[in-house]
Each structure stands twice: as C-alpha cells, then as structure tokens.
C-alpha cells in the first residue's frame, strides 16, 4: 500500500533521480512513494540494494531521510550499507538523524552505522539533527548522547555484564507509553513490547555508532562473499598509550594529513597514527577524521605479512578523536629515507632496494586479490619498519570492489594533491581506478627509489594536475637499468590498456634479477647470462650489484666498516684517484677491468665510474648514494668470499707464488696513476666540471681500450699483469674503488657548492661595485653640499670650459615632476665659474652649475659691503643682471623644469660669508704662485673692462645667456679678506643648519655660494621665490635679523610684485611642494636717499599717492592667496602702512621669479624680445636689473646709444631729506622688518623656539644700533652723511647691522661720495670685534698690496689718502650741502650734461656686447602665462615717479657736479683705492657706478 511521502522542510539535501526503467530506478521510485510491497518484491529479485541515483543516494538514504522505518528495516536486512557515502559525503545515518526517528537511527547503528562520519561540509549526524528543528532534534540528540555514554562506559573498563543488559542501541531508545511514562524499547518487536531482562541478542556484535565491537570471534563475509573470521581489535583509551622512558620521541609524517609517533602500549612498542589537523581547522577539514575510520575498517579486515598490522584503536574520552595503533616502525617512510633524511642513510644497497620492491608488490597483489584498489600508493605509503623490511599502509583512500563491479569509497575524500606525483592520470582526473592504477604508482616508486628523484621532478600537485589535463605525461627515466627501465616504461603508459605488465610479471622479473646477481657472484662471466645481457646495453646504470644481507641501520655503522676496510676518504691518495676519475671517468683504473674480466665475485666498478660521472651531466646528483652502495656492496661480498668457499682457498694456494709480485705490481701502477692524476688534475682542474659529461658508449668493451684518453703504456701492461689476481688483491682494489667512489661523490657535491658560492660571490661583488659607483657619484654630488671642505677657486676658468656630462646615479632619486631626462642639456647651457677640478660631476645637480655666476658676484658684494657702499651698489646691480640671466637659463626647459634644479639653483646665493669662512683653511693652503697668476689675470681683465675693450666671446646658442653672466662676473671672482662680524659667524652656523636639513632629501644641493650683500646675510633662503638680486626676505631658519633701514621698505613693494605673480604660478607649477621650500628671492636695493628727500616726498604726494593705494590693495589681495610649501604670509598693510605716503612705486624694482621671466619672454614676439633685451643692456639697467613687460617701458631720449626707454628704477644717490623724517622712517622700517620676519617665521614653521631667537636677535640689534646712534651724534657727523650710510645699509655685511641705524640717525646732508671714510671707520669698529683673520691670509693680502704699491699710492694721493680724514670730508660735505640748497635749480642742465659725459664712454663700449650677450637662444622653452596687466601698470607708474625723482634729485644736488669738477676723479679714486686695498687690486676692474641719471629727459 503506497502513500505520498512529503520531504521534510527544511531539508539539507535534495533527492536525486533515476531516469531509466531498471529495477534500481523502480526501487528508488517505490521508496519515495512509500510502496512497501513493491519494494520488497523488487528486493527479492536480487537487485543491487545500494544502487545510487543522480546524487549518489541509495534507497536506504532516501528511506531514512523520509522517516520510513519499515523500509529502513527491510533494506538493512538485505544488506544495504548504513555508512554509504553520497556524492556530498553524507550517509544514511545523517539522513536518519535529520528525520528525528530514534528507531531508524538505532537500526542503522545496530547495522554498523557510525556517528563520527562527516559530510563534505564537515557536518556530522548530530549537526544534521540540530538543523531539523528543536521539536524533532531534542529526542534524537539525547539518544545519540546515550549511545556515546554507553560506549564510553565500555571503553573505560566496565564489566561485560553491561553488554549483556544493553547489547543493542535499540535498548537505549525510549518512547512515551500510553500511561505517560517511559518504557524500554524492544529491538526485536514493537516499541510497546517489553523485553525480559538478561535476554541477549544472538548477533553478539555490538555497534553503538562508534565502530563495531565484538566479544569473541565470529564469521563474516568479505566484499568478495568469502567466509572469514573477525579478528579481535581492542578498543583502548588515550591513557593506555604512553611515551617510552628509554627512547626519545620519534615522529614522522605518513602522508599529507597523518603523523606517526612511536609510543608504548601495555609494554609493547607500537607506532600510533593520528590526524595532523591545523590549530584552527576549517569546518570542512573535519571530514579528514573519517580517513582514520576508513583505514581502521580496512585494516581490521585485512591480514598480510607486508601490510602494516593494526593492533588496536584508541578513542578519546569524548569519542571524537580516533587514533590507530600499529606495529612499531623504526625507520620511517620510504619518502623520508630517500628525500628528507638521506644524510642518515647515505648508502642504500641494491639488494635492499630489490627486496623492498618485492615486498611492496606482494602486499599490493594481496589487496588486489581481496578486491581492493589502493589508489594512493606512494613512497609515503611504504613504511620501513626495520632494515630491509617494508610494510604497505595508508589504506584510507582505498576502494573496495563490490558486486556488479561497483567500487565502494568509505570517505569520498579526494586524493590530496601532494600524492598526484605518484597517482595515475585516471586517479588525478577522478575517473574510475583499477588495478592498473596501482601498477602505475608502483612503477613510479620503482623509478623514485632507483633515481632518488620524486616523480615529476617534485613539482607541486596542482601543477602536475594541470600538466595531465593539458595532455603532458611522464616517461621512464633513461638512467634506469634495463630490466627496471622496461618495467617502468610499461607501467606508466597513459592508457590503462597499454600497461600490459601486471604485478605477477613484475615480481617474476625482480626475482630473476635477484637470482642473477646472486649467481653472478660465484660463476665466471662467460657462464653468467646477466653479464652478457648487460654488457651490450648502452645505458650507464647497467650493472647494479647486490649487497649483502646485512644492511646497516645507521650511518655510524657504515663509517665503522669503512674504517675497518682501511678506507681514508679524505686522504690525498684517494683524492688523486678521484680526481682522475672525475676528469675522465671513461678511463677507470685498469684494475677495475681486471676485476671485471677475472673474477665475478666482485662486481666490476668500471660501469659505475661511468654511471657515477653521468650523474652530474644529467643534473641528478642524488644518484650518488645508491651508486656508492654498489661499490660498497662489492667490498662486503669480498669479505664473505674470503672466509667462505674452499674454492677460494684453493685459488689462493695455486696462485701463492705469484701473489706478492702481482700485488706489488698493482701497487706500483696505482702509485703511477696517482701521480699522473695529480699532475693532470693540477693542470686541468679548472675545466674538470666541463669535462664531466661523457657517454658510456666511449668505453670499448671488446678490446678494453679507451676512446677518449690514452693511458701510458705501463698502464696497459698492468692490465695483463692483473688478469690472475687473487681475491685478496681484489679486496684491496675494491677498497680503493670504494674510496674513489666516495671521494667522487664528495667532489661532485663540493663542486656544486663551490659553483653556488662562486655565483653568490659574483652577485655580491656586482652589488658592491654598483654600490661603490653610487657612493662615488653621491659623494661627488655632496662635494658642493659640504662646500666648506673644498677650497675656493684660485682663478677664473677659461671662457670656453664646458663641464663634463655624467649620467644620473642609480642611488639618486629624481624629483616628483620626473623631468630629469631634460637635465643632460644643462652643462652646455650653464658654464661654471668655478675651477674645473672643483665642479660638480653629477648630472643630476648640474642644473645648479650656473649658480656659480652669482657665487663670485655675491662674494665680492659681501666684501664690498663692509664699508664701500658705492662699489657694493654697483656689484649688487651687476648681481641682479647675472642672477636674472642665470635663473632664466637654468629654467630654459620650461615651466615643468625639475623642481629640484630650481631649488638648488635658486639657493646658490643663500650662503653669504660662510662659504668663505669654510674655505679659509683650504684657501690658506693655496700656492702663492697661483694667487699671483690670478692677480695678473684679474689685473688684465680689469684694465680691459675699465677701458671698454673687453672682448666678446663667440655666440653659443645654448650658452649665450650664461656667457654674459660669466663675463659679467669675471672681475668678481677675487680673493677677499676674511673680514667678518659676529653675525657673519652666526650666519655660518645657519648655513650649516640648512645644509644638514637639506642633505637628507636626497638632492646633493650646492650650498657653497657667496653672499650678495648685507641682506643676503640677514635673510636666508626664502621659499618659493626664485630670483637673484640684492635683497632677500628674512629666512625662518636664520638666527639673527639685523635691521634693513629703508632697504627693506623698498623691497617690500618689490616683494609684492614678485609674490603676486609667483603665487599665481605656484598653483600651476608642476614642482612638488618640497622642491621649492628653500628657493630664494632677491630684490633690488632702491635709492635710500629718495626716501629722505623732501622734494621726493612732495613728488610722491603729487604723483603716486593714488596708484600706490591701489597697488597696496592689490598687494594685500595677492598675499591673501595660499602659498605652497609654507610660503611666508606678509602682512603688507602693516609693513607699509606707516610709510605709504613716502614710498613711491617707482622706488621699487621688481625682479620677478624665473618662471615669470620665461613666460614673458616666450609669449612675446622675437622683435619685441630683442627690443626688450636691448633695453636691458643699458648701463643704467646694470644698477637696477629689471625684466618686465613691454608695456612697462617708456620711450625716453638719453645719450646712451641704444636705449629707447627710461629705466624703471635707478638706485643712484639723491639729496637726502630731513633728519627727522629719516629717523622716523628708519624706525618704521625696523618695526616692519621685525614684524615681517616674525610673521613669516610663524606662518612657515610655527616654531616658538626660533621666533624667540629672532626676537632676541632683534633686541640685540636695536641695542647696538642705539649705541652707534649716540656714537654718531657725539662725533658730530654732518647730516649729509646719512645718505651714504643709507646706501650702505643695503649692502653692508651682516656684521654691521647696527651701523645702518646709526647712519639713519645722522642728518642727511652730505653726498655719498663724502661719506665713505666715515663709513669705513664705523665698519672697522665692528670689524675689530671679530677674531683676527688667518695670519697666512693677511700675509697674502699684504703681499698683494706691496706688489701694487705704486698704483695704490697714486690713488691715495688723488683721493686724499683713501681712508681720508673725517674732518676734511665733513667740511667738504657741509659745503656741498649748502651749495645744493642754494643752486639746485640752476645746475640741473649742467649736471645732466656732466652725467652724460661720465657715462658716454661706458655706454659706447659695452652696449653692443651686452645686447648680444642678452640675446636668448631661439629655442627657449615656452613658459606658463601669467597675468601681467597689473605689473605693467605698476611699472609705468614707477617710471613716471622715477623721472620725477631724478629731476628733484638733480635740482637739489648742484654742488655735486661742482665738487666733481674741482676734485676730478679724486672721489672716485678714493672709493676705488679703498676697495682695492680690501681686495688687493692694483688697478680698477669694471665696476660701473651711476650716481645720477639724465634719462628723465
């Protein structure tokens, strides 16, 4: 009677289907329908009860899942397997647990069902039960717990009466009775029928879900339906297996997941196998525990001498962990012996190898007869329990053949990939495995044990599987001897049908081979078919001797036996023999030939020589071990033969008379061979490795001759003398051969090690060379970073010098913009002014070579600022010109030029005095002759410059701009007296601090630069702004901040112009923020006198008040923009607020950043560019370099030949204003400077410590200024002195900051020319505070002064003694001032004419040259566009204001021209003489000083 069966919900699995009309399909369908009658009818027809559907599910699984108890009973009675694995690894026990029916589960457990099994997700039956819901799972889980408790009680040793009372899981089932109570179930009847106590089932096999247990033997049917007895397999607890006290712990792996450990059980030494799971296993890995259960079931049924015997099963207390107790294994797996612990077993005798192979084949044949397929046969599965004794195990993956050819897999766990190296292709591809699959694996083991190589060269299993899938398969190793080669070649065919050789055939071949070896030891070679069979075989491993029957367990015993035989593996004698064998193994010792042909009791080692030597050629050094064994086994056999047969004794008696002679002759030949080998080895030792490749075919077995090497005739004669050797002589020879083989093996190993060491040393040497190259380039690049370690240039280099071009060092990192590939063009564009031997050799930093244009210029400016305002002014202007040229040329590559190059080039003028201080020591070491030569060259160049005859170098398209800079700076590259002030000393430390901070950036920056002027001393490097002129903004890193006087006020407006344009471009620049942090910006020093001229103030009020206000608004807007890399945020409103009414825009000369200049240049047409460059060449512009848009130029008429515009700013001295205005403006300027520096510092670095330092420095500067103020007042300095001192303040050294304030506080009435002697006096006042300069340097300066004394005397006379008396000059200045006040309006035209006459000569000789030098190359790179409207408008206004200023100046300084007419060139010579005395010059150089200008016409 059928009924519809509903599938439990939620069901963990789906039910499969069968779509055919077979009885098996009908069985499944009737089970699903619940038709018990039809199911029983079909079962009576004798169908296969465990037929599976599409998901691998049996009818029992379906019945248990649906909770059909009657179906389960009948299916179990017909032999259905309760532990059958579906494709997902689940069993009918899982299905019964999910159904929640205790009776179904108890029936399955009673039939042998196991509660420990897991599906592929690692879930056991208890987990399935819990997924069925709380209502159904509660009782079934409690039932499982009762079964586990009962099993634990049995294991713990409870009496047998317990099994009598509860002999079946069904007795543990409880169901609700009609009375509401619990009654005990009956396994043989309905649950309601009670069973009498003490009734025991006749089955007598107890299974409670943890394996079958039985109290006595009983019959059972194997898979082949054969009657058999069940063996007793004890179930023990964990505490019964312990570690032995008299032996160390020994464990080894027995496959990928199993580990074997030697322990003791009840006094018996056993080996326990357990699962080696990771510490935190994945859930699916729990299914690996089923492998031990499967092996336990297989091992409990199988008994064979060569199968590892299972002695007991050890269950943990919670029954979750299973361990199998096997017989003791003393050595380990074959895999560990061959590959992991080969050093412990260096010699594997061939006889042992053959015995092991025979044992494995026998065990495998037994499994096949029993209907099992091992499937996982490998060297892991072969366990060597003792020397020469192997056991086959690892049966967990074994398949059992059942009825109708069905194979039963107890685990459904796929074969591990680690075993794919030995597995047959069909096993790897998870196809049906047969006995041919085991033959394939056996062949792999045979090849592995004979070659010491893991199959597939030890590739990973996943790679092997990919190779098999792609159609790649293994072939037999050609190194195998012939019988074994045939076996392997036949056994590893891809297709199973091609594996024609079965295990019985293989066993027969191995047996015969063993017999042949044994018989060959006691018969003549002509009688031995083995020798004849192998002699013609071309393979190198033909002759495999068999060892004795007593292989040693440990290498120590083998070493002892070697010693007993007299072997000395490390002696020179053996080494010499081995060397010869290595050099030409085809030419073995003739005694080996004799031993082969004369006596077969000792195997011939000649083939072994060839076979051993072939090992390196094939790249398989692992052959050495078993090849050594062959020689070694021959020695052992000789020992046995010496003691054994009477035939041997008779041969000794017969050969007695000739034995001693033959032995002596043999020893002599051996000595000869050793000597020859020594000589030959010493000559050709280097080529021994290459000569180890040879072929066994080179040996001529017919005549014994050598095809590759002809031995001496005596050696050939020795062959005939040794034909009648006795066994004693054979023993001695075999001993030598053994030593030879051992040493040959050692030498091969040493050669490999030496080769590896040589490779490593070569790699290390290459790395060291590369590192040294990097370090050399790095050190070269750091030469200018540590500039103080290098001497100053001893003279100007030649004009046509081009620095070398070097490649970038590997250790130097390019900047973030990645523009270094454009740097190789720099050396041609930037000629250096330093000595050729001192230039930078690293291409990465050659972008800063042009910075040396400003190096010498700024150095001379710093010196001139120590008391020569006039010269310093001119030099500052020249520096502006050169700096503009340099910055332009250094950025010719375009707006994306290397930021690090911009960084390095623009900081060249950072270091004012420190570079000279650093190099004082090296300068003192210079040769006096070099100084003299330099002096003469400078003198000659100065003459040319003074007379306007300076030659023009030829035009170079790529270096035209820098050539002008070079020519402009040649007069400046002179030695300077080391006059320093305390502030200069501090500045030296500041530069060192910068250098220390900059070096780790990886850019070898050039910090060896000169100072432009006083402000360069006062201010370090200003971030972001990069032009070279005369004024810098305060650096946050600086330690002192002397006041500027009006110089900073002038620079403030200039700063705005530059900052405004640059801040816009900085947002578009490709430079990284880090690359522009130390870029400096210098500004023109404006006319100080105009600030203090009442007429200038009036002019300012009339003409520029409104534009300045507009500009100030623009300035504030520009400075409100965020700056990259921590640019200074200047509060210009406060800085310029107090002086807005007296600061004309025309007083500021904006020297914009390099990018601005390049952009302007690239944007304009060539014609406009030429006009602009021509305008820049004006001599007037040399005093105030400007590079501005065309709109800023104004047409003007002047006497300079090629100028068509008025300069935008002229820093010529004008008549000073009142004392009060000067003093007040100075104080305002001082406050502005202080505020600016503090604001700038806080915005950039926010370092309270440095801000405090700056404040302290300013306080000290103010105090010093006040002291000098009083000093000036007490010395009755005329008011006219102020103007000159104001001019001085822009260029005076850092050592005289307070002098500026002192000068400001005096009345401004005298001209600049009159103020020089007093300025020198005050400058000397501070110079005296410094420590004395180097005596050697002073001597050099004094020598230069003496050599040019006549010129100096002449200048001193005309200039009233250069130093001049302060009183005379003061008197003249007073007269001049009075004259100016009276005749300012009358002498305007006269002064204009005089000024034109003074400058006419200079213009006439220099204009063309300067114009031509300023012509930029046509290939200048386009730059980014920047807004120029506001700047041009500002410059136009500056020109207007400048014109008015010059008019006022000319009107109030009439006496200046008068004094010039009276004194002639005395004033100018006075300045020059003082300047020359400082520098050691005897004649003037080209220092252009324009005090006034007539360009305003």
UniProtKB/Swiss-Prot annotation:
Its main location: cytoplasm. Residues 227-518 form the Protein kinase domain. It is found in: Cytoplasm; Midbody; Chromosome, Centromere, Kinetochore. SUPFAM superfamilies: Ankyrin repeat, Protein kinase-like (PK-like). ANK repeats lie at residues 27-54, 55-84, 88-117. It comes from the Eukaryota. Transmembrane segments: none annotated. InterPro entries: Ankyrin_rpt (IPR002110), Ankyrin_rpt-contain_sf (IPR036770), Kinase-like_dom_sf (IPR011009), Prot_kinase_dom (IPR000719), Ser-Thr/Tyr_kinase_cat_dom (IPR001245), Tex14 (IPR039339). Residues 848-877, 963-1048, 1144-1174, 1348-1470 are annotated as: Disordered. PROSITE patterns: ANK_REP_REGION (PS50297), ANK_REPEAT (PS50088), PROTEIN_KINASE_DOM (PS50011). Residues 989-1020, 1037-1046, 1160-1174, 1368-1406, 1428-1460 have a biased composition (Basic and acidic residues). Expression restricted to testis. ATP binds at residues 233-241, 273. Phosphorylated on Thr residues by CDK1 during early phases of mitosis, promoting the interaction with PLK1 and recruitment to kinetochores. Phosphorylated on Ser-437 by PLK1 during late prometaphase promotes the rapid depletion from kinetochores and its subsequent degradation by the APC/C complex. Interacts with KIF23 and RBM44. Interacts with CEP55; inhibiting interaction between CEP55 and PDCD6IP/ALIX and TSG101. The protein kinase domain is predicted to be catalytically inactive. The GPPX3Y motif mediates interaction with CEP55. This is Inactive serine/threonine-protein kinase TEX14. It comes from Homo sapiens (Human). The lineage of its organism: Eukaryota, Metazoa, Chordata, Craniata, Vertebrata. The gene is TEX14.
């Amino acid at each position: 009677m059928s009924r519809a069966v509903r599938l439990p919900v939620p069901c963990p699995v789906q039910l499969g289907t069968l779509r055919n009309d077979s009885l098996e399909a009908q069985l499944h369908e009737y089970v699903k329908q619940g038709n018990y009658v039809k199911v029983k009818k079909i079962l009576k027809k004798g169908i296969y009860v465990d037929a599976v559907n599409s998901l691998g599910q049996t009818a029992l699984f379906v019945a248990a899942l649906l909770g059909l108890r009657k179906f389960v009973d009948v299916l179990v009675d017909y032999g259905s397997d309760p532990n059958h694995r579906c494709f997902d690894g689940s069993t009918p026990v899982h299905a019964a647990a999910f159904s929640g029916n205790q009776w179904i589960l108890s029936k399955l457990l009673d039939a042998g069902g196991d509660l420990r099994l897991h599906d592929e997700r690692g879930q056991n039956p208890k987990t399935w039960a819990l997924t069925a819901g709380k209502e159904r799972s509660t009782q079934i889980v409690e039932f499982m717990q009762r079964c586990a408790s009962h099993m634990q009680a049995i294991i713990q040793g409870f009496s047998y009466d317990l099994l009598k009372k509860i002999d079946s899981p069904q007795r543990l089932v409880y169901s609700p009775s009609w009375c509401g109570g619990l009654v005990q179930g009956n396994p043989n009847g309905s649950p309601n029928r009670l069973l009498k106590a003490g009734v025991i089932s006749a089955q007598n096999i107890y299974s409670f879900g943890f394996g079958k247990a039985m109290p006595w033997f009983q019959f059972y049917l194997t898979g082949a339906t054969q009657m058999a007895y069940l063996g007793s397999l004890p179930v023990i607890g964990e505490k019964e297996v312990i570690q032995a006290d008299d032996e160390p712990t020994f464990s080894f792996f027995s496959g990928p997941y199993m580990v074997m450990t030697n322990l003791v059980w009840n006094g018996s030494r056993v080996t326990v196998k357990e699962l080696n799971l990771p510490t935190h296993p994945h859930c699916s890995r729990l299914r690996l525990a089923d492998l031990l259960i499967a092996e336990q079931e297989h091992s409990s049924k199988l008994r064979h001498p060569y199968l590892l015997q299972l002695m007991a099963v050890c269950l943990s207390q919670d029954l979750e962990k299973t361990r199998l107790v096997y017989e003791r294994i003393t050595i380990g797996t074959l895999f560990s012996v061959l590959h992991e612990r080969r050093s412990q077993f260096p010699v594997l005798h061939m006889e042992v190898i053959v015995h092991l192979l025979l044992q494995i084949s026998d065990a495998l044949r037994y499994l096949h007869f029993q209907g099992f397929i091992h499937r996982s046969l490998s060297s892991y599965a072969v366990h060597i329990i003792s020397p020469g004794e192997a056991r086959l195990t690892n049966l967990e993956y074994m398949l059992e053949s059942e009825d109708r050819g069905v194979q039963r897999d107890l685990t459904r766990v796929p074969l591990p990939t680690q075993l794919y190296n030995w597995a047959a292709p069909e096993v790897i591809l998870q196809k049906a495995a047969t006995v041919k699959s085991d033959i394939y694996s056996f062949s792999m083991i045979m090849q592995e044990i004979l070659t010491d190589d893991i199959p597939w060269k030890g590739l990973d299993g996943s790679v092997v599987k990919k190779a098999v899938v792609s159609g790649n398969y293994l072939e037999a190793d050609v190194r195998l001897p012939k019988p074994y080669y045939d076996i392997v070649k036949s056994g590893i065919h891809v297709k199973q049908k091609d594996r024609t050789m079965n295990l019985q055939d293989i066993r027969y071949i191995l047996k015969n081979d063993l017999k042949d070896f044994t018989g060959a030891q006691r018969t003549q070679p002509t009688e031995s078919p083995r020798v004849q069979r192998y002699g013609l075989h071309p393979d190198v491993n033909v002759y495999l001797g068999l060892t004795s029957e007593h292989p040693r367990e440990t290498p120590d015993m083998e070493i002892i036996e070697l010693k007993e035989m007299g072997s000395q593996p490390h002696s020179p004698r053996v080494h010499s023999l081995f060397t010869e064998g290595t050099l030409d193994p085809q030419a073995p010792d003739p005694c080996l030939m004799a031993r082969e042909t004369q006596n077969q009791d000792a195997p011939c080692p000649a083939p072994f020589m060839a076979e051993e030597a072939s090992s390196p050629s094939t790249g398989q050094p692992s052959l050495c071990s078993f090849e050594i064994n062959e020689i070694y086994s021959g020695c052992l056999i000789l020992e046995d033969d010496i003691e054994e047969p009477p035939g041997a004794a008779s041969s000794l008696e017969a050969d007695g008379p000739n034995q001693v002679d033959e032995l002596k002759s043999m020893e002599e030949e051996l000595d000869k061979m050793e000597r020859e080998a020594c000589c030959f080895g010493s000559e050709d030792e280097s080529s021994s490795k290459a000569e180890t490749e040879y072929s066994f075919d080179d040996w001529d077995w017919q005549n014994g001759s050598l095809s590759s090497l002809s031995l001496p005739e005596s050696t050939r004669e020795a062959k005939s003398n040794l034909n009648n050797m006795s066994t004693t002589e054979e023993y001695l020879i075999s001993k030598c051969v053994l030593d030879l083989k051992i040493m040959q093996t050692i030498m091969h190993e040493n050669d490999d090690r030496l080769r590896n060491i040589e490779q490593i040393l070569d790699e290390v040497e290459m790395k060291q060379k590369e590192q040294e190259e990097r370090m050399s380039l790095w050190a070269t690049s750091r030469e200018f970073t540590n500039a103080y370690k290098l001497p100053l240039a001893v003279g100007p280099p030649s004009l046509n010098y081009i620095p070398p071009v070097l490649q970038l060092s590997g250790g130097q990192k390019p900047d973030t913009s990645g523009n270094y590939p454009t740097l190789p063009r720099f050396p041609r564009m930037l000629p250096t002014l330093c000595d050729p031997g001192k230039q930078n050799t690293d291409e990465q930093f050659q972008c800063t070579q042009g910075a040396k244009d400003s190096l010498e210029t700024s150095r001379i400016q710093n010196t001139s600022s120590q008391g020569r305002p006039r010269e310093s002014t001119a030099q500052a202007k020249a520096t502006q010109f050169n700096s503009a040229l340099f910055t332009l040329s250094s950025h010719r590559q375009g707006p994306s030029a290397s930021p690090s190059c911009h960084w390095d080039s623009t900081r060249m003028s950072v270091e004012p005095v420190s570079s000279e201080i650093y190099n004082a020591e090296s300068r003192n070491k210079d040769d006096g002759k070099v100084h003299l030569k330099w002096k003469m060259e400078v003198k000659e160049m100065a003459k040319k410059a003074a007379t306007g005859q300076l030659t023009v170098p030829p035009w170079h398209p790529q270096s035209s701009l820098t050539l002008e800079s070079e020519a402009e700076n040649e007069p400046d590259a002179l030695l300077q007296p080391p006059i320093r002030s305390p502030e200069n000393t501090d500045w030296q430390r500041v530069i060192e601090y910068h250098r220390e901070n900059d070096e780790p950036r990886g850019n070898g920056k050039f910090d060896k630069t000169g100072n432009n002027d006083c402000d360069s001393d006062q201010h370090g490097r200003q971030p972001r702004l990069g032009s070279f002129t005369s004024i810098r903004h305060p650096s946050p890193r600086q330690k002192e901040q002397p006041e500027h006087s009006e110089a900073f006020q002038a620079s403030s407006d200039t700063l705005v112009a530059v900052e405004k344009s640059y801040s816009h471009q900085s947002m578009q620049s490709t430079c990284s923020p880090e690359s522009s942090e130390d870029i400096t910006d210098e500004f023109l020093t404006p006319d100080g006198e105009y600030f203090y001229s009442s007429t200038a103030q009036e002019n300012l009020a009339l003409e520029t008040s409104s534009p300045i206000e507009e500009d100030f608004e623009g300035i504030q807007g520009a400075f409100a923009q965020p700056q990259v890399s921590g640019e200074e945020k200047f509060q210009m409103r406060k800085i310029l607020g107090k002086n807005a009414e007296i600061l004309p825009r025309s007083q500021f000369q904006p020297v914009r950043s390099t990018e601005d200049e390049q952009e302007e240049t690239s944007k304009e047409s060539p014609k406009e560019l030429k006009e602009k460059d021509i305008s820049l060449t004006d001599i007037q512009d040399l005093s105030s370099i400007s590079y501005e848009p065309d709109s800023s130029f104004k047409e003007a008429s002047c006497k300079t030949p090629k100028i068509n515009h008025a300069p935008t700013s002229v820093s010529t001295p004008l008549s000073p204003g009142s004392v009060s205005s000067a003093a007040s403006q100075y104080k305002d300027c001082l406050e502005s400077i202080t505020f600016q520096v503090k604001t700038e510092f806080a915005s950039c670095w926010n370092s309270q410590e440095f801000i405090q330092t700056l404040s302290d420095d300013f306080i000290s500067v103010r105090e010093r200024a006040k002291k000098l103020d009083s000093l000036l007042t007490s010395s009755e300095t005329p008011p006219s002195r102020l103007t000159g001192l104001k001019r001085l303040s822009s260029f005076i050294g850092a050592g005289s900051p307070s002098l500026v304030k002192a000068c400001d506080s005096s009345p401004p009435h005298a001209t600049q020319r009159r103020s020089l002697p007093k300025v020198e006096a005050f400058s000397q006042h501070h110079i005296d505070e410094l420590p004395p300069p180097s005596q050697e340097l002073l001597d050099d300066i004094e020598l230069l002064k003496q050599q040019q004394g006549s010129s100096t005397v002449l200048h001193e006379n005309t200039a009233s003694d250069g130093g001049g008396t302060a009183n005379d000059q003061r008197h003249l200045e007073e007269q001049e001032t009075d004259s100016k006040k009276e005749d300012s309006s009358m002498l305007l035209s006269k002064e204009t004419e005089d000024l034109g006459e003074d400058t006419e000569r200079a213009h006439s000789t220099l204009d063309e040259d300067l114009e031509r030098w300023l012509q930029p190359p046509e290939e200048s790179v386009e730059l980014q566009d920047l807004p120029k409207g506001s700047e041009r408008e500002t410059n136009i206004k500056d020109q207007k204001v400048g014109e008015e200023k010059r008019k006022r100046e000319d009107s109030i300084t009439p006496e200046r021209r008068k004094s010039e007419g009276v004194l002639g060139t005395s004033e100018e010579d006075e300045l020059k003489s003082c300047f020359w005395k400082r520098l050691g010059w005897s004649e003037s150089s080209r220092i252009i000083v324009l005090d006034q200008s007539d360009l305003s016409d």
